[in-house]
Amino acid sequence: MSDYELTYNDYDSREKILPERDKAYTPVMEAIGLSIEFGGLPAVDDFNLTVGRTEICGLIGPNGAGKTTVFNLLTKVYQPTRGKILIDGRDTKGMSTIQVNRAGVARTFQNIRLFKNLSVIDNVLIGMHNHTHYNMLTSTLRLPKYWKAEKAAREKALELLSIFGMQDQADAEAGSLPYGAQRRLEIVRALATGPKLLLLDEPAAGMNPSETTELMENIHKIRDTFQIAIMLIEHDMSLVMGICEGIAVLNYGKIIAKGTPEEIRRNPVVIEAYLGKKRGEKQDAEGQ
């Protein structure tokens, strides 16, 4: 658990009560009144959420609830109809997807999007493209600055791969990796952009229990090593309840509950709306 506690009410979903030692706390991301409509119908409606600088936050809800749409809004794949997004206090209005990435937001996708014909390390190096420090002339003429930057980038890529135990697969073709390893590689590539906030869209999809357990350990390792915030969409409740410090529940584009894992697993609104259980039934969210 993080050193601060989140509390919420029905009117201000961004309210926080912090211990005295956390007075210096600042959020890395704030979504305020975020809404988007498609064909006049709301896909996300008045979405309010604050993610702390090193928080692991879960976004859960049934299929079609709008979770991936939220990620698309945060990364500017979609522009919101209303509301705003702050990254480190900076309004992202008018930013492109690339600019938001440079501002510190990286993501993975439900469906793996690797360059499968390229090597593992080349996939990671592509993630570093926005942060290379040489111009076209330097690159074209292969000047010393180019080789110095390329060497530094490769060393950094190998360092990132080693966190996931993938350094020995650096020269392997990405498409030849097992499914779980491809998932890990996609996370490494996102980390290569140097994010402050990492968005993981169903990172455990298709993984077996052993791979899921390893993923949980790796998510903690990423947060602790890089001191970044992680926000994840996931249907595996054991994973969500096991690693998230704060959870928001989305249904029909609206947040219906927020709180700690313990609060969410006991919340009758979540049990009824998300898990399909009547309020009188005793089974909690984690038991699904």
What are these regions (language model features)?
Residues 2-288:
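Glycine-rich phosphate-binding loops of nucleotide-dependent enzymes
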